[in-house]
């Protein structure tokens, strides 16, 4: 398995402490999702803890902020939470059945071509190119940044 980290002039380094999603971004998302009736079922603290234990991971604080506010919802791409048919637990388990070497991540979406979009133990957003020698590429330093980069407000 190859791991590639995208580097750019504007990339940031995350501190070791967890960073919560900016209030301004949460409010932008809330306005958009409410206007388009696209908010899922928000996750409870208990549901988050159970999912983390079942998957053996610790969710990033910005992912927790997102799913506790919006559940499964659209933010430039569909972000899977704990509700719905394509939820983070089932999608992560499905990936691990086929690719058992992927253990410290959880699947939050896909790219539309079947390549899972995941968050790793550092909180970085990665894409797993399952058809190209199991290549993993870091595409954003955090979920918050990934949403900022990909969220079009219609």
Model-derived features: where do they sit?
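N-terminal amphipathic/basic-hydrophobic helices that include classical n-h-c signal peptides
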Residues: 1-20
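A surface-exposed partner-binding patch
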Residues: 15-117, 151-154
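Segments surrounding the PLD/"HKD" phosphodiesterase catalytic module and close analogs
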Residues: 117-143
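A short, charged
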Residues: 140-154
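Intrinsic-disorder/low-complexity loop/linker signature
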Residues: 10-11, 84-86, 123
């Amino acid at each position: 398995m190859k791991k590639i980290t995208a580097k750019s002039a504007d990339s940031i380094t995350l501190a070791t402490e967890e960073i919560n999603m900016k209030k301004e971004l949460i409010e932008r998302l809330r306005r958009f999702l409410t206007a388009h009736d696209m908010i899922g079922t928000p996750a409870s603290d208990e549901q988050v803890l159970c999912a983390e234990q079942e998957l053996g991971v610790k969710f990033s604080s910005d992912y927790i902020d997102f799913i506790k506010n919006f559940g499964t919802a659209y933010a430039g791409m569909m972000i899977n939470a704990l509700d719905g048919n394509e939820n983070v637990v089932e999608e992560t388990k499905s990936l691990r059945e086929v690719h058992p070497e992927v253990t410290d991540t959880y699947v939050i979406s896909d790219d539309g071509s079947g390549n899972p979009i995941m968050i790793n133990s550092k909180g970085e957003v990665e894409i797993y190119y399952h058809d190209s020698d199991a290549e993993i590429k870091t595409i954003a330093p955090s979920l918050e940044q990934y949403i900022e980069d990909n969220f079009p407000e219609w």
